[in-house]
Amino acid sequence: MRHRVCATLIEEQQILMVELHTPSRTFWTLPGGGVESGETKEQAVIREVLEETHLHVTIERQLYEILIDQGIETCFLVQRTSGSSSAPRLGIDPELPFDQQELRTVRFRPLKDLQDDPQIARLLTLL
């Protein structure tokens, strides 16, 4: 069973999100990805945020763990490490060739504009 992690980073009423473009659709989601062999969920979420956004984060707490179509998803509330004040920059997925990258954009998006997003709505009930 595949285990996926995601990160919730909120600053000034905005949430960090990445835009993905897959062969079937384009959508916004939280930074995250799969847990690699020998890696903890916590290590995976820190690595995924760094790969996708170039931000260094620490974990505050686990927000949820749910069953999804592809396996299990665990989401963590994270914060930037002290001294990490740079803006997020688009990273890469090292598992995909350069010409097949799915990451398109990374930025903070206003929470008030995302009330209808099911993933964000779930998070807001847990914060």
Q: Language-model segments: which ranges?
A:
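Short loop/turn segments immediately following the C-termini of beta-strands
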Residues: 20
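A short gly/proline-enriched turn/hairpin at secondary-structure junctions
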Residues: 29-30
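A conserved beta-turn-beta hairpin within the catalytic core of GNAT-like acetyltransferases
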Residues: 23-26
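Conserved hydrophobic "DFG−1" position in protein kinase catalytic cores
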Residues: 9-10, 17, 78, 108
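C-terminal/domain-terminus segments
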Residues: 124-127
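Conserved N-terminal beta-strand and adjoining loop/helix that marks the start
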Residues: 1-16, 37
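Unchanged
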Residues: 35-58, 67-119
